[in-house]
Amino acid sequence: MEKVKHFLKHAGIKIGLFLRANWAYILWGGLHYLIANLALNALSRDTATGMQNTFFIYLISIGIAVSPLGEFILRSLDRARPVETRQDKDYLLPLFEEVYEQALNQTPSLNKNITLYITEDKIINAYAVGRQTVMLTRGAIDSLSPEELKGAMAHELGHMTSGDSMARVITVVGNGLFSLIVLVCKIIMLIFGVIAALWSKKYILSIVIGFIVHLLFSYSVTAFLFLGDIIIALNNRSREYLADDYAYKIGFGEQLKNTLYQINALDMGGRRSLKDWLKASHPYTTARIARLEQKLEREQVLY
């Protein structure tokens, strides 16, 4: 009985931390469900049936997202492959194993089967997906030093420990299904509008009304998606700082700082517009560098 209580307490704490850390993804999922529910109910005379259908779709999407299939789908979309060549294995795997070992020492509950993958994208990037996937772009491998790559890997493992990577998988799957539902609804609305117009004596008025309804629906969806992007971006920016903190905790703060300096030096994007800033998933790189420098300077003073 005590073991059961301990398990439930531990599980409750983990769920609570996940909910608190990923409130934006949960809110975004709720909004997806609401809009998809309204869209399906518009095509059904039975509201209860529409709600059941929407709930069933979301159960399937979440089931796919949290399964290995969800990670496989996203890896396939990014054309990610395991580290295969002898040169890449000899270079990258020792770096990853060093960082991974430190992460496991800090967080024993971290998945023991995380695998490193490579995408042939030329931009400098690294990201975590689900529970078992860390990806490096070819651009990062070619442009960053071994120590800088360690910093990037440590940062991504930080995302995994907080559940960010799993929440992102669920969000991507939800977005995909939502977009599909919206597309189907728009096509059906358009077809019904044309049919109704052809059979109506006031076909011109019917066409105009159908066009207005279609336009309002499209703009409402666009506004909803933009609002959702802002909510997710706001949450993501705060999560980036926490992943930086994790890299620092496991001993790779200096390496990550140098990684960010390198990324900042190669950033040719210029100033962000207001729209770009609202939808940006990462804070300004210089702000992250300054934050890490403060931590490292305090550490030097203490020791």
Please report, for each region that a protein language model flagged, where it lies by residue:
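Catalytic Zn2+-binding segment of zinc metalloproteases
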Residues: 157-176, 252-253
